[in-house]
């Protein structure tokens, strides 16, 4: 009964996506896009080198409703519910809105470019295979390794955070018990496979959407003085008064921008999931369109309401203020209104959101490692799948990273959190910038080879200019990160803070130089890019190079071609 209900939802969503993309998708020049071609049964994968489809491929089991909810709430978790406390304390309410709005446009432009690439090349490993194809194989390797590593360490990161959130209830017992509970749950979901990931994210994302909407409504009531137990009365915009509105000035804005990037990391998972989505040419672009609502609802609206009901100078907002417990500012907002029971309910939501991020991270890391092996960037054993199409060895290695979380039992939880976070944070900036650069290169190759934009199955609504903006934002984000790393807020400059903030950069550079040295790779020349390689279904046939032979060179009246006419044909063909 329940499965039939979900099948009906999937069918209706798919029909809605088809209608939306075929009839109402608009480009930046105001023209309608062409109808998407029906993909063939075979799934064409590409990499460096290109490998034909074989039995060692991922299966397309993510349904339209899965893709929709992954796009809306897939990676909403620690960054929003916990990291927003640091953002509010470091930058104040105005800096939060400005930073998240600007970084939000950065994400929108990036994911729109990714949707264009994913629609024509829905491949395993998604975006960093584009880096190898359109930028440099060494860059694809370096970014791919860092992307895998960043999500692999996110698993123990979330396992480390979970007990700190549970300590809100003054939980007793060893931390390792709570780590083990969540560790086992994540392992069980991974054993379930792609279906498990999709179903868990579907329900947890619904929970997060309902919770955030509920928080927004409650915050309006609190700010208006409608809660009888809140002795503050009508709050209004009193927390937006100077000097709290722009804490720490420009440095505070830079610090919040860095937090915003971390909070929005994982948005590109829609592109990674393309390799296991049913009908990715249609579901991926349609899912990407939901990202706008994710950013607007979860971040802009929710954080604005948070700034109205929680003062930025309140002690305990920063994660470093408490060594054994993490209290979300969303929970603090409810506590300040003296509402009983509800803080615990909100804390449960945040705890489950942590599980959601850990689940998404293990999925992303295992699929990234699978793609690295498939493209010759990692040992071939990680390219193997079981009969259900699950990369079992890649999953096993990824899950082993979760054991790092047990170091919290030794009393180094806070320090471990910081170092793991350092690997995750900056890598997101490199990923987004590389996606935009690959899209620019793709468009250049498309133009040089005299292709028409109308022939693309999906076009980025921001065009190539959106990707140029994305590359520029990447440079500015790296500068902001460097500035905050050298001059941290509330501290004197020290090497530990700097390396925690910028450790991802040397990892990327070392990986790039090493691969380039040992494999002697070179930057990809635009005119030599084979646009048909790796294209999906009918798109591959449409992109095959056509040899135009002048009709007059062939002697039609003759039954047998002369040597001279054949030489002319061969000459024109070459």
From Swiss-Prot:
Q: Where in the cell is it found?
A: Membrane
Q: Where are the transmembrane segments?
A: 69-89, 94-114, 173-193, 202-222, 291-311, 391-411, 412-432, 470-490, 498-518
Q: Name one GO molecular function term.
A: amino acid transmembrane transporter activity
The protein's predominant localisation is membrane
Q: How does it sit in the membrane?
A: Multi-pass membrane protein
Q: Which Gene3D superfamilies match?
A: Amino acid/polyamine transporter I
InterPro entries in UniProt: AA-permease/SLC12A_dom, Amino_acid_permease_CS, APC_YAT
Keyword annotations: Amino-acid transport, Meiosis, Membrane, Transmembrane, Transmembrane helix, Transport
Q: Work out whether the entry's keyword set contains Glycosyltransferase.
A: no
Transmembrane helix among keywords:
yes
**Where is it found, in Gene Ontology cellular component terms?**
membrane
Q: Which family does it belong to?
A: Belongs to the amino acid-polyamine-organocation (APC) superfamily.
Protein name (Swiss-Prot/TrEMBL): Probable amino-acid permease meu22
């Amino acid at each position: 009964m329940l499965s039939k209900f979900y099948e009906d939802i999937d069918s209706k969503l798919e029909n809605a996506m088809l209608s939306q993309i075929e009839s109402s998708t608009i480009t930046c020049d105001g023209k309608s896009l062409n109808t998407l071609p029906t993909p063939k049964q075979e799934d064409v994968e590409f990499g460096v080198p290109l490998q034909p489809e074989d039995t060692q491929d991922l299966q397309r089991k993510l349904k339209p409703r899965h893709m929709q909810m992954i796009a809306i709430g897939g990676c909403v978790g620690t960054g929003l519910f916990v990291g927003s406390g640091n953002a509010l304390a470091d930058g104040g309410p105005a800096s939060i809105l400005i930073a998240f709005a600007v970084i939000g446009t950065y994400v929108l432009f990036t994911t729109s470019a990714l949707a264009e690439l994913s629609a024509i090349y829905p491949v395993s490993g998604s975006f960093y295979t584009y880096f190898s194809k359109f930028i440099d194989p060494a860059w694809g390797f370096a970014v791919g390794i860092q992307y895998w590593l960043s999500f692999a360490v996110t698993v123990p990161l979330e396992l480390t955070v979970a007990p700190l959130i549970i300590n809100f209830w003054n939980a007793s017992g060893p931390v390792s018990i709570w780590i083990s509970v969540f560790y086992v749950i994540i392992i069980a979901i991974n054993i379930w496979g792609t279906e498990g990931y999709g179903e868990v994210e579907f329900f947890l994302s619904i929970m997060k959407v309902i919770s955030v909407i509920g928080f927004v409504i409650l915050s309006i009531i609190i700010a208006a003085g409608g809660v009888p137990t809140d002795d503050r009365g009508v709050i209004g915009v009193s927390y937006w008064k100077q000097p709290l509105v722009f804490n720490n000035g420009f440095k505070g804005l830079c610090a919040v921008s860095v937090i915003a990037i971390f909070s929005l990391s994982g948005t590109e998972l829609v592109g990674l999931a393309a390799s296991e989505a049913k009908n990715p040419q249609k579901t991926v672009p349609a899912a990407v369109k939901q990202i706008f609502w994710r950013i607007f609802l979860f971040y802009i609206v929710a954080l604005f309401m948070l700034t109205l009901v929680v003062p930025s100078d309140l002690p305990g907002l920063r994660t470093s203020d408490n060594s054994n417990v993490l209290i979300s500012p969303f929970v603090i907002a409810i506590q300040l209104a003296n509402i009983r029971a509800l803080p615990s309910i909100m804390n449960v939501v945040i705890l489950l959101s942590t599980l959601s991020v850990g689940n998404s991270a293990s999925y992303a890391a295992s699929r990234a490692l699978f793609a690295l092996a498939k493209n010759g960037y990692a040992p071939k054993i990680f390219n193997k799948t079981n009969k259900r199409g699950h990369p079992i060895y890649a999953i096993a290695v990824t899950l082993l990273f979760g054991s790092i979380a047990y170091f919290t039992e030794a009393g180094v939880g806070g320090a471990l959190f910081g170092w793991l976070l350092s690997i995750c944070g900056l890598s997101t900036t490199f990923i987004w910038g590389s996606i935009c650069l690959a899209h620019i290169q793709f468009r250049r190759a498309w133009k040089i080879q005299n292709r028409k934009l109308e022939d693309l199955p999906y076009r980025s609504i921001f065009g190539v200019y959106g990707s140029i903006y994305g590359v520029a934002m990447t440079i500015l984000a790296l500068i902001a990160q460097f500035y905050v790393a050298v001059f941290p807020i509330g501290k004197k400059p020290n090497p530990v803070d700097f390396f925690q903030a910028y450790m991802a950069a040397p990892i990327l550079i070392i990986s790039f130089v090493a691969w380039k040295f040992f494999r002697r790779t070179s930057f990809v020349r635009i005119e030599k890019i084979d646009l048909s390689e790796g294209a999906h279904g009918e798109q591959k046939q449409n992109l095959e190079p056509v040899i135009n032979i002048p009709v007059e060179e062939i002697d039609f009246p003759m039954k047998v071609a002369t040597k001279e006419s054949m030489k002319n044909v061969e000459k024109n063909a070459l």
